[in-house]
Amino acid sequence: GFTDITGAQNSIDIENLARFAVDEHNKKENAVLEFVRVKSAKKQVVSG
């Protein structure tokens, strides 16, 4: 399942991933969304 990532608001790695996701979305959809901040983040643990 999914679990919360503690300290996500202060994580440079998570912020960089979010900025990348917004940039990629804007390229594919010809949109002009702007990244503002990370509110929360979750991770998924997959076994196997």
Curated annotation (Swiss-Prot):
CDD domains per UniProt: CY (cd00042)
Family: Belongs to the cystatin family. Phytocystatin subfamily.
Protein's recorded name: Cystatin
Molecular function GO terms recorded: cysteine-type endopeptidase inhibitor activity
InterPro entries the UniProt entry points to: Cystatin (IPR027214), Cystatin_dom (IPR000010), Cystatin_sf (IPR046350)
Disulphides: none
UniProt motif (Secondary area of contact) ranges: 44-48
Keywords: Protease inhibitor, Thiol protease inhibitor
Free-text function comment from the UniProt entry: Inhibits papain and cathepsin B (very poorly).
